[in-house]
Amino acid sequence: MNLRARRLEFVLLYFGTPLALRYVPDLARRFLGAAPRAWVIPALLLVTLGVVLSEAARGRLRAAELFSCRAPAREWALVLGRFAVLAALLWALLRAMHPDWLWAFPRRAPAFWLLVMVAYPLVSVSAQGVLYRWYFERRYAAAFPGRWSLLAGAAAFSFAHILFRNPWALLFTFAGGLLFLPTYRRTGSMLLANVEHALYGDFLFTVGWGAFFYEGSQAMAAAVAG
């Protein structure tokens, strides 16, 4: 496949698909009278499954890459230390903007919060790791020169969150893409990149920023914003 075709495929998958899914609720309301509930995660899982099956059909699926765990201790220290600093900054920013949101989710809906803390890393982060790190690196990264490759990967990861319909989701996830993709590139460890992704995601939900990332019901937004 030539470079132009590979880039077009990248745009269709990482930008065309989220854009189409963005309008699913609107079209469902218009033509069916009701919007589907809790459909984002199933859609993500279907796309991820399609990607994995596509690679398997081409004979290019290496299970060792999908379940790679090894990373030097210094990389774990870097990821955890950086998270501690950025988590403190995110807490301070939310405290300045919406102090009433701080820790509201676990306080007001502890059972739902616990479910999110467990399910988000196991389901959502794992699927996104396959789609936005493993698959992007093996199929599309080489289609972009130099630093454009990292920007393309971060932009793709960010644009997936257009489904949440707010700029904060796009901003946070673009920054996340600039963190998680280099971690995977440096180490080749899906585990470390996914742990880093899960740390930030679970922290955002817990501290109060999760109001910008809920889907399927109003429970999280109500728990955070009151």
Give the ranges of each region predicted by the language model.
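Membrane-interface helix/loop boundary segments of multi-pass membrane proteins
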Residues: 130-152, 185-189
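Short juxtamembrane and helix-loop transition motifs at transmembrane-helix boundaries
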Residues: 1, 110-114, 128-138, 153-161
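N-terminal, membrane-interfacial amphipathic/helix-forming hydrophobic leader that caps
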Residues: 1-71, 208-226
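Small-polar-interrupted transmembrane alpha-helices in polytopic inner-membrane proteins
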Residues: 86-90, 146-161, 177
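Juxtamembrane helix-loop-helix connectors linking adjacent transmembrane helices
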Residues: 62-124, 137, 142-143, 217-219
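Functionally important transmembrane alpha-helices
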Residues: 169-226
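Membrane-embedded alpha-helical segments of multi-pass membrane proteins
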Residues: 12, 16, 41-47, 114-119, ...
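Hydrophobic alpha-helical transmembrane segments
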Residues: 8-12, 76-84, 113-117, 147-155, ...
